[in-house]
C-alpha cells in the first residue's frame, strides 16, 4: 500500500526523492526473543532452554533468504547518503533451509541437542527467495556471512538478555 501511495505522489506532484527497501527474513540482536518472534529468534530461545532436544515444525526443507538486521540498516543508510531513489529487494542472496539454520545454531551453541521434526505441523512456504539483482547492481551487499551474523545474535541473547 505504501508503495502505491508513493507512486501516486510521484505522478501527482513529481516528487520522487524516496526509496523503498523490501528486506528478506531479517534477524539480529534486537529481535523478539519471547518465542513469538522470527524463526531464528524463536529457535535461539528453544536451543538455549533445551537440555537434550528441540521440536521443529515440518521437515526442515523450506528455503529462506535470511539477512542480518545490521546489513539492512547499512543498506538503508547507503540509499539515503548516496541519494539513491529506487525500490529494491534486499537479501543475502543465499538459500538456506530451515534445517541448515537450526543445525548452524546448534553448532554455535555447542550444546549436544537433537532435532525432533514434527511432520504433523506445517512446513510453511517451501521457498522464499528474493531477486536481488538490483541490490547487487547498486552495490548493496551484506557484509556479514550468515554464520557470523547468527553467532552475534546468539551471543547477544545469552550475554545481554539473560
Please report, for each region that a protein language model flagged, where it lies by residue.
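C-terminal substrate-binding subdomain of Rossmann-fold SDR/epimerase-dehydratase oxidoreductases
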Residues: 49-162
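Flexible, glycine-rich beta-alpha linker
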Residues: 16, 21-40, 63
Amino acid at each position: 500500500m505504501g508503495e502505491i501511495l508513493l507512486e501516486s505522489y510521484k505522478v501527482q506532484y513529481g516528487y520522487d526523492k524516496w526509496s523503498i527497501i523490501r528486506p528478506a527474513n531479517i534477524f539480529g540482536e534486537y529481535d523478539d526473543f519471547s518465542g513469538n518472534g522470527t524463526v531464528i529468534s524463536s529457535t535461539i530461545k528453544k536451543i538455549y532452554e533445551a537440555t537434550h532436544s528441540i521440536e521443529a515444525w515440518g521437515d526442515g526443507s523450506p528455503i529462506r533468504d535470511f539477512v542480518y538486521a545490521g546489513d539492512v540498516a547499512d543498506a538503508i543508510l547507503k540509499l539515503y547518503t548516496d541519494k539513491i531513489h529506487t525500490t529494491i529487494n534486499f537479501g543475502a542472496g543465499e538459500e538456506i533451509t530451515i534445517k541448515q539454520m537450526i543445525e548452524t545454531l546448534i553448532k554455535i551453541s555447542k550444546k549436544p541437542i537433537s532435532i525432533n521434526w514434527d511432520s504433523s505441523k506445517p512446513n510453511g512456504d517451501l521457498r522464499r527467495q528474493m531477486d536481488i539483482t538490483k541490490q547487487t547492481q547498486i552495490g548493496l551487499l551484506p557484509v556479514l556471512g550468515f554464520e557470523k551474523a547468527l553467532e552475534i545474535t546468539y551471543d547477544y541473547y545469552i550475554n545481554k538478555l539473560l
